[in-house]
């Protein structure tokens, strides 16, 4: 089976490509570096020729509200048009849990991307926040030597748990719906970030702040976790930290 992975050289993409190739599939790791650009359309027709499945893992180079919305809308339209022309049979998109319940620009852009998907059998995978992004989350919430976080629940998932699920979903029949995935541990946001910072030797204090926002958006207790049944990964935060430190 020919499978095209858009964003195939990124964090999740590279792992997904490796898994699918090990299973014997013909996999194209598509990215601007390989001559495939979903914004300009360059290389899409050639990359998608003969493909049965497309996995969209592309991410915006900018997180500014207007720029990220334009990226996902333009990329999504170009990619889906190319898939229609190539008679692709399954479109898989990686998205984010709670994007329809959280008010920030990036989440709004991902929701707009989801809404573009029509006319092609599809599966949307909504994941909770990646463990690999914990440092960025802490930095974005920093106020001097303190990290201010809203009093909400958090359930991050490791990239090594996400990629196998993405590969499995891509090889299965389209669901024409949404699959939610999350990490195995649910705890308070500040507790998880505090554990992470302590483990890496970061002395910043983590505090609960009801006025704190998440990347500019207000969140409530369950805004960042699945509300119903979700498929859970196996890698705990402690295990992920152990693996990360072993690689360092």
Question: Model-derived features: where do they sit?
Answer:
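N-terminal Rossmann NAD(P)H-binding glycine-rich loop of SDR-like oxidoreductase domains
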Residues: 1-23
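Conserved beta-loop-beta element that borders a ligand/cofactor-binding pocket
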Residues: 90, 95-100, 115-133
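A conserved pocket-lining segment of Rossmann-fold NAD(P)-dependent short-chain dehydrogenase/reductase
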Residues: 123-124, 136-157, 161
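Glycine/proline-rich active-site loop of Rossmann-fold NAD(P)-dependent oxidoreductases
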Residues: 132-143, 169-179, 185, 202-203
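Mobile cap/lid helix-loop segments that border enzyme active or cofactor-binding sites
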Residues: 193-248
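NAD(P)H-binding glycine-rich loop region in Rossmannoid oxidoreductase-like domains
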Residues: 22-86, 96-101
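Glycine-rich Rossmann NAD(P)(H)-binding loop
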Residues: 148-153, 179-186
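Non-catalytic, hydrophobic alpha-helical segments
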Residues: 12, 54, 162-166, 181, ...
